[in-house]
Regions:
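Long, charged N-terminal interaction/targeting segments
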Residues: 3, 7-152
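Cys/His-clustered metal-coordination modules, chiefly Zn-binding fingers
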Residues: 114, 120-202
Length: 202
């Protein structure tokens, strides 16, 4: 699974490898409630928007595209995930427990999650290698878990679509527009404000 995740992620990131172990742990915990993994629909919540997302996607098949992986439900930036049965909403949250990481024995691992790594005096690749090596000595020893009931809709509502009167493209009506009297997509709104994400050059 680590090899698959690394191939998908394209770089040897500590967070990705640690995430693989976290997902594996959460799946094992779920097996205690639901021994047959094919008997229910697995969903996931990710509390951060970095490497852990890819660990979840490659190991569970819960992706942003199929909406089995929820990213917007929680925006707290904690390195944690929840795997749960969509029908019962019951599952497990696995998270990094900093109290279990000895700062003296595993300085790079602690610094990685505390965001205190010294990038000025070391190369990022070297720090990542040291972090991974320290993690492999403790593995699940730095995780804690909680049994949880997830309070989000089992399925996302179908968002209405509109046709932008400026660019002519259809778009999902997700947020309140700046000018509710006109059907203008978010990109064209930002373009009018000269704050667009990209500029068409040809």
């Amino acid at each position: 699974d680590i090899d698959k995740a690394l191939e998908f992620h394209k770089k040897n990131a500590p967070g990705l490898i640690i995430g693989v172990y976290m997902v594996d742990y959460a799946l094992e915990l779920l097996d205690g409630i639901y021994p047959d993994r094919n008997s229910y629909t697995l969903n996931a919540l990710c509390e951060t928007r970095v490497c852990l997302i890819d660990s979840i996607q490659i190991m569970t098949g819960c992706t942003v595209g199929n909406k089995y992986l929820k990213l917007n439900a929680m925006k707290n930036g904690r390195y944690a995930l929840i795997l749960y049965n969509r029908d019962t909403s019951l599952g497990y949250r696995v998270y990094i427990d900093l109290s279990k990481i000895d700062k003296e024995k595993y300085p790079q691992l602690y610094a990685f999650f505390a965001k205190t790594r010294d990038y000025k005096n070391a190369v990022r690749k070297e720090l990542s290698k040291a972090t991974i090596e320290e993690f492999y000595t403790v593995e699940r020893g730095i995780f804690s878990y909680q049994k949880v009931k997830v309070n989000v809709p089992a399925k996302d509502p179908l968002e209405p679509a509109k046709i932008c009167e400026i660019c002519g493209e259809s778009y999902l009506f997700l947020e309140k527009p700046l000018n509710p009297e006109r059907d203008i997509c978010p990109y064209c709104e930002q373009k009018l404000l000269k704050n667009e994400v990209f500029e068409v050059i040809s």
